[in-house]
UniProtKB/Swiss-Prot annotation:
Keywords: Ribonucleoprotein, Ribosomal protein
Biological-process GO terms, alphabetical: translation
Protein name: Large ribosomal subunit protein bL35
Pfam families listed in its UniProt record: Ribosomal_L35p
One cellular-component annotation, GO: cytosolic large ribosomal subunit
Disulphide connectivity of cysteines: none
InterPro entries, sorted: Ribosomal_bL35, Ribosomal_bL35-like, Ribosomal_bL35_sf
Cited Gene3D superfamilies: 4.10.410.60
Annotated family: Belongs to the bacterial ribosomal protein bL35 family.
Domain of life: Bacteria
GO molecular function (one): structural constituent of ribosome
Length: 65
């Protein structure tokens, strides 16, 4: 049986941590930023953890992580 492939999109966007959690970047921060307030842009900085309701699909996309 051949190996399962990791989805390239998940590989580029997600980082698996040592405790089993998955880290992701915030969306809506790439373009059309002039109409967004400074507060909104500040709150979109940094990374957050993937929610537990999405972890099953993330694990399916990254079988060896």
């Amino acid at each position: 049986m051949p190996k399962m492939k990791t989805k390239s999109s998940a590989k580029k966007r997600l980082k698996v941590l040592g405790n089993g959690g998955v880290k992701r970047s915030m969306a809506f921060k790439r373009h059309i930023l002039t109409k967004k307030t400074t507060k909104t842009k500040r709150q979109l900085r940094g990374t957050v953890m993937v929610h537990e309701t999405n972890m099953a699909s993330v694990r399916a996309m990254m079988p060896y992580a």
